[in-house]
Design a protein with these regions (language model features):
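Active-site-adjacent structural elements in enzyme catalytic cores
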Residues: 1-175
Length: 175
């Protein structure tokens, strides 16, 4: 297992590689937004399936939200984040280069996880997905994930904080 600390995780991300880390729901694979292709490659994921942009606090994500949805975004974020809720919301026109969907929306989330929030305070928002090979149930422990992704760095310390083991609830913004 390639266990890394926060400083090494940041170096890995800046080199364009994804890392594995825990969240409040399922373990995540994440990368800096400009390197989104690597998640699709490692997961063997269909490129038509969007990724989720995670941050440490909603202020990190607000620039990614279209102006027509900011009021609703703020209201929902203040009520349900941090937590196991992913908001699919119209994306800002200035941030379209990170879009992984075809309908100009972006999934946004702030996990209720000290480790994940601490990581993203350091790195900024990360594009993420659950840490599994697409189409297969993923492991929920660092040891199991290391078997699926032996070449990827896993953020420590181990054992990870307790998570729910269930995917986040997804809500879509409608005008």
């Amino acid at each position: 297992m390639n266990l890394v600390n926060f400083k090494s995780a940041l170096k890995t991300l800046k080199r364009g590689l994804p890392i594995i880390f825990t969240t409040d729901t399922l373990p995540a694979i994440g990368c800096l937004p400009k390197f989104s292709e690597v998640i699709y490659e490692f997961k063997k994921r269909d490129k038509n399936k969007p990724l989720i942009l995670m941050g440490s606090e909603h202020k990190q994500l607000i620039d990614y939200v279209h102006e027509s949805a900011i009021e609703d975004f703020e209201s929902i974020a203040s009520k349900y984040w941090p937590g196991a809720l992913t908001m699919v919301i119209p994306s800002s026109e200035k941030e379209t280069e990170i879009l992984t969907s075809t309908d100009n929306t972006l999934g946004l989330r702030i996990p209720n996880s000290y480790m994940a929030q601490s990581l993203m305070l350091l790195t900024g928002p990360l594009l993420t997905s659950s840490a599994n090979i697409s189409g297969f149930n993923g492991a929920t422990t660092s040891e199991g994930i290391a078997l699926d992704f032996p070449s990827l760095s896993i953020l420590g310390p181990i054992p990870w904080e307790k998570s729910s083991g269930k995917a986040s609830t997804i809500i879509a913004w409608k005008k």
